[in-house]
Amino acid sequence: MKASVFLALLAVAGAFALPSQDIETKDITTDFIINLIHRYIELIKGAGLDPLKIKNVAYEYNGNLLQLKAFVEDLQFTGASNIVINNLHNNIFLSLYDFDVVIPELSLTVGDSGIEANIWENIVSAEFRGSLSIKNIRLAGQVRYRGSLIVGVEIVSIVMQTGIGGIEADVNVIANGNDHSAAINVFLNDTLPNTLENYRNEINALLARIIMAIINRRT
């Protein structure tokens, strides 16, 4: 399997963040990953996606079967361009590559937003406002390989150690006149983080299998 496939996948995982510190390394693999991350970041920042600020935007569509109105006010999304690289290390003697990167926080605030749709004379409406913060998004793991970049590399196995530090949500959600805020806040603040933690091993194993499947398909 080609090493470039895995390296590209790892770089994409960091595509929404910029290293918060400069890392000098003589390892060609680590340099390659860092350079790819920086290239993605340039695209993201150049597109104005971090920070993303929307003061006021509205949309309206009127069709024969569908009429739609939507608006967003005072939206701000930050944090995607901040990544902490805890470890990127290639042990050529053991044929192991360790990586550990963290996005400290992704933050979303919405002053007000809403949507109203008329589908075949059935009206559906929803309102959303509030804040959402995801803390310490961690992508870590270990890759075992055979060979070298000169003669070719085969990925033998991947072990993932992903997770989040927590979710803080304070949102107001109304759908068709019914207030679902309390239930959604409980789900985001408690149920979802607890579920991710309880099934962390299964999620990491599944993620590793998916990455291996992508690598196998591309090679």
Where are these regions (language model features)?
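Tubular lipid-binding modules of the TULIP superfamily
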Residues: 14-154, 161, 218-219
